[in-house]
Amino acid sequence: PYFLLENRCWDNGRPAKKEVDVVFCLKEMAGCLSSIGYFVVPLQAQSKTNIITCTHMGGFFGTVSMQSCVADLFYGTDYNSHLGTRRGGMAAFHKEKNAFIRSIHNLERDYFRSKFEPTLSRFEGCTSGIGIISDNDAQPLVISSHLGRFAIVTVAKIINIEELEKKLLDQNMHFAELSSGKTNQTELIALLLIQGRTFKEGIENVFNHVKGSCSMLLLTDDGIIAARDKWGRTPIVLGRKDGAYAATSESTSFTNLGYETDRYVGPGEILRIRPEGVEQLRAPEQHMQICSFLWVYYGFPTSS
C-alpha cells in the first residue's frame, strides 16, 4: 500500500538534473498530492538508498517586541504543542540585566502550560525570546562564543550526525549535552555555526555540512535570526503586529496573538528580526522540497 513521492524541479518542461527529496505516503494520498507537483511511483521500482526522512517532529516560536514579550512567547510556543511530546523550552533576553533566562521541561507526562506557567515570573521584563516543542533534543541551548552570546533552537534531522560528530571531535571540540544517550543535534549545529566569522557565515557552514534538514532560530542581544532549511523542508512563517515581529513553524498562533502573516521565509533564507524591522542576511534558494507530511500528518489544519 506504500508509494514513494518525488518532488522534482523542472527546467523548460524537463526534469532538472538534481537530487530529489523523497518521502513515504499512503496510497490514498496519491490523488491529492499529485495535483501539487508530486509524482507517485511504485516503491519497489525505486532504490531505498535515496529515501530521506524529513525531520523529527518539532516546532518553534520566536518574538521580538518594543514591550514585554512573555505572554506572546508562552502562548506562541504552546501553539506548537501538536508537533512534539517530549521536551519544551523557552529562552528570553533581558536587556536591563543583560542576561539570558532559560527554562526547559520534560513534557512526556505533563502539558506545556502546566509545566511553564509557574515559572513565567522569571521572564518578566524580557522583550525578545524563543521557544521550542521538541520530540528529541533538550533545548534551547545558550552558547557563549566569539560571535557573542546567543540561544538556539532547531527543528532538525541530521542524517550524517555520526560523521559530523567525529569531525568536530577531531578538531578538539567537545559535546556537553546528550539527548537519550546520543549527541544533542542542536549542540552539534551550534558548534558548526560558531566556526563562521559571522552568524550568516556560520549558518551557511551548517547548510554546507548537514545532510538532512535543519531550520533554526537564534536569540541574540540584538534580536532574532531566523534561518530556514536550505531545501525548505520545514517552514518558517513571519508575522507582525504593532511594535513586534514573530517567527514560527506554523501560522496557527498568529490570529489569537494579534499578528498578521507578513511573509514566508524562503528555502535557505536568513533573516535578522528586530522590533523595528526585518533585514535579509541571505537570499532564498530558487528550489524548494518541502515535507509533504505537513499537509497530511503533523501540520495543524488551520495553519497556512
Question: Predicted segment positions?
Answer:
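Conserved short alpha-helical segments that host acidic/polar catalytic motifs at enzyme active sites
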Residues: I52-P267, R272-S304
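Short, Lys/Arg-enriched N-terminal segments with co-localized hydrophobic residues
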Residues: Y38-H56
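Polybasic, lysine-rich low-complexity intrinsically disordered segments
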Residues: N7, K17-K18, K27
